[in-house]
Amino acid sequence: GCCLTVTAIEDGEMRADIGPETVRVTTLGLLRRDQPVNLERAIRGDGRFGGHFVQGHVDGIGNIGEIREDGDARWVGVRIPASLERYVVGKGSIPIAGISLTVARVAPSRLEVMIIPFTW
C-alpha cells in the first residue's frame, strides 16, 4: 500500500497524481487502466481503531518468496533490496501489501513475517 491524495472522483473512478519516485518504489506502474485496487479513506486521529498507525510512504519493493503453512497461520518470506536491510528490525513493524506485520526473522536481503488467518 501507499499513500496517495485523491485529486478527483467522477463516475465511480478516482484520480491521483503520481510522481516518478512513487512509480519507482511501488508497483503502481504495473497497474492497468480500469484494474481494481483497494482504497481506504484516511481515519481521524481522535477516534478508536484496531491496530496502529502505518504511514503509506514507500521506501522500496520486496518480492514475496516462500509461503509455508504453520497450523492455521502462514510464514511469508520476503526478499528485500540490500539498501533497505538497515531499516528492518526484528520484532519491528513493516507494512507489506497494506498490512502492518511484525518482522519475525531477519536475514541478509530477506525477512519473514507470520500472517494469522484473520489477516490472510
Question: Which stretches of residues belong to each language-model region?
Answer:
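Conserved loop->alpha-helix
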Residues: 1-120
